Amino acid sequence: MFIIGESIHIISKVVSQAVKERNPKPIQELAIAQTKAGADYIDLNLGPARKNPEETVQWLVKTVEEVTNLPLSIDTLNPVAMEAGLSICKKRPLLNSASGRTDSKERMLPLAKKYNTDLVLSVLTDRGCPPDVESRIESIMETVAYANELGIPNEDIWIDPILLPVSADQKQVGEALEFMKILPDILPGIKSTIGLSNISNGTPEELRGILNRTYMVMLGRYGQHSVIADALDKELISLNKGEMPEITSLIYRVMDGEEVDLSSLSQKERDYLKTTKVLKGETLYSHSWLEV
Amino acid sequence: MQFKAPVESYSGQVREITIGKGAKALKIGGETTLPFHFFDEGSIPNPPRFALEVWDMEPVTWAKWLLEPFKDVVSDPVKWAMKCAKDFAVDAVCLQLASTDPADKDTTPEKAAALTKRVAEAINVPLIVYGTGDEKKDVQVLSKVAEVCDGENLLLGPAIKENYEEIAKAALQHGHALIAQTPLDINLMKELNIKLGKSFPPDRIVIDPLSSALGYGMEYSFTLMERAKQTGVIFKDGMTQMPIIANLGGECWKTREAKESKEQGILWEGVTALSLLLAGANILVLRHPETLKLLREIIRRG
């Protein structure tokens, strides 16, 4: 699946400082590192981009395009910044994101058509985040139909199910996964993405990686097209390339409910097994899930 | 065609815990099925237990109809506790060490511990002891209480994420059971039990997931207790198999609704208590003896 590198994110102190000072160096270092690591897209997350939106996003786009040939994902809630960013990208960019919310349908969505970009569509509506598979389906069918009517085909649309942290709402993890599984049946030809690192938000920092990687493998089994993730996680890139077939097949076996003898596993395999069980919803999550 | 009701059986068990000593000993929990599922297989060896809340100082904010049953003893915690044990058929007394609040009277650990011992010795039922929830003060108070009441087998709490180590150590050293408290979050609940379990026996832990009153978040407590119970009994998660305490009296009686009339107050406490019983609470701390009587009657008839 495609990896959209998430490191250039306005919440990072390094990034926000560099953007504030218009210092290209830290930004370019991150762009180069992600490119070298094997990312397929570079995400530029500006957040709400309230201050000088057009100038800021265009500076960011130009700065990053100086050092990488990868296509960009422009990630902001601000339609003014979004338009300014999309309009100058050298390669066909990804509009990250629009949703079923009224203001987004009216102001964000049409930009994908205007600038001929790929489009991330999330399941959000004016009522917020749908709480289960059924309501996600209902919401996305409506939003995709709206996009289709504007002339945007399914092949250019990447659906985001909105992923919540396992430590906040364990049940939603299963709902998002189930939704991604059903997606190809209800919207043939449609693509997908997801904010992978959300799964581990709130979990102690050193334990976040294995949650991200395991969930990625689980999503991949159902044909996930892309993830917005930490491209600098070597093991994540490696897993995605199929370079760790034992781990991948172990995760699949646990997903299938197979009884696996723990004593036959290495420490790493045991960790992936336990993590899969938590993400499946079979084991109640706690920060100590690897110790039990 | 005759309808045959399905009968479920589960393989998990809620741990049984004993508090109090000798003739006073009280067993809590131990069930191998879901709350009130008498129609399923499995056993419910102990009925729900009820305690009344007693303060170590005269409360100033309680409604007059709440103070009414205790009005002649409310300034003497020992007499108050004795009255609960003697007149109101409690299974246990819950002593709230309200005066140790550093923002209020800031009673010393020594004084609180001495009083606790007097109360424990005066009553013929086991004693539950709650600190005020002040992270630092509770460590001093509960450790001292544990030491001074060595051998009484109290149920002590709250032990929280920020201070459980020291409190658990004192409880273990002096033979008391522990209340592990987390703020309405099942994942944090499990986490605290795992952490505690490293140095304190899981079969001496009671879970307090925090009980919210009707209209003020009761459904959060309800779903949490229900989930914890199901995870333990159905899915055999050892870190959710502890008995549950619902310390709901204070939460209910501080509501605007409970302060409007006696009847409404009793109903507020009663509905909250009944709901949490159905969710899986094994021991409940109430404030009004009439609520306690009402609940026992409901359970008896059911």
Label each PLM-derived region with a short phrase:
Chain B
Residues 1-71:
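N-terminal amphipathic alpha-helix/helix-capping segment at the start of soluble metabolic enzymes
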Residues 46-48, 89-91, 123-127, 150-154, ...:
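Short, well-ordered coil/turn segments that N-cap beta-strands
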Residues 49-79, 104-107, 131-135, 157-158, ...:
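Active-site mouth loops of central-metabolism enzymes
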